[in-house]
Amino acid sequence: MKNITDSFLCLSYWPSAGSFGFDTDILATNLINLSVVLGVLVFFGKGVLTDLLDNRKQRILRTIRNSEELREGAVEQLEKARARLRKIEMEADRFRLNGYSEIEREKLNLINSIYTTLEQFENYKNETINFEQQKAINQVQQRVLQQALQGALGTLNSCLNNELHLRTIGANIGMFGAMKEKNN
């Protein structure tokens, strides 16, 4: 390495008139040396620079394509999600309406059932009252009839003879049988 540096230093000490050499002082270099160096850099660096730019361009295009594909996939998923959301909202509305109508239907059924039960209780109450009234009337009639019969028997026994007594008893038994048939 020292030999290469020494050779460049030797070249810089040579007189510039009539010879060709490298001038290491950048401010003192002439335009021709700069153009030669730039020409060499452009000639040899052009391929490297073109490859770098092409690679960068390909990466950018690949990234753009991937981004577009991801965007399209995201848009597709978003549309599917929106469609699912609309479907679920429609089902929720349908269930809500069905639920409300079912609740109203059950409410009406319950009200009708309670009304029917109350009517049955009212009918049972009225039947029970009528039965008890009829029972009380029958008991009063039987008691009145027994008392009347006892009073009549007492009166007959005291005032009638045996033959008249038997005829009166037969007539009363006939009347009692007719009353009993009438009540049943």
Swiss-Prot record:
Keywords: ATP synthesis, CF(0), Chloroplast, Hydrogen ion transport, Ion transport, Membrane, Plastid, Thylakoid, Transmembrane, Transmembrane helix, Transport
InterPro entries reported for this sequence: ATP_synth_b/b'su_bac/chlpt (IPR002146)
Domain of life, source organism: Eukaryota
Membrane topology summary: Single-pass membrane protein
Signal peptide extent: none
Pfam families noted in UniProt: ATP-synt_B
Chief localization: plastid
Molecular function (Gene Ontology), one example: proton-transporting ATP synthase activity, rotational mechanism
Transmembrane segments: 27-49
Subcellular location: Plastid, Chloroplast thylakoid membrane
GO CC annotations on file: chloroplast thylakoid membrane; proton-transporting ATP synthase complex
Coiled coil: none
Complex and partners: F-type ATPases have 2 components, F(1) - the catalytic core - and F(0) - the membrane proton channel. F(1) has five subunits: alpha(3), beta(3), gamma(1), delta(1), epsilon(1). F(0) has four main subunits: a(1), b(1), b'(1) and c(10-14). The alpha and beta chains form an alternating ring which encloses part of the gamma chain. F(1) is attached to F(0) by a central stalk formed by the gamma and epsilon chains, while a peripheral stalk is formed by the delta, b and b' chains.
Function: F(1)F(0) ATP synthase produces ATP from ADP in the presence of a proton or sodium gradient. F-type ATPases consist of two structural domains, F(1) containing the extramembraneous catalytic core and F(0) containing the membrane proton channel, linked together by a central stalk and a peripheral stalk. During catalysis, ATP synthesis in the catalytic domain of F(1) is coupled via a rotary mechanism of the central stalk subunits to proton translocation. Component of the F(0) channel, it forms part of the peripheral stalk, linking F(1) to F(0).
Family statement drawn from the similarity comment of this UniProt entry: Belongs to the ATPase B chain family.
PANTHER family: ATP SYNTHASE SUBUNIT B, CHLOROPLASTIC (PTHR34264:SF3)
Misc remark: In plastids the F-type ATPase is also known as CF(1)CF(0).
UniProt-recorded name of the protein: ATP synthase subunit b, chloroplastic
Species of provenance: Cicer arietinum
Lineage per the UniProt record: Eukaryota, Viridiplantae, Streptophyta, Embryophyta, Tracheophyta
Gene encoding the protein: atpF
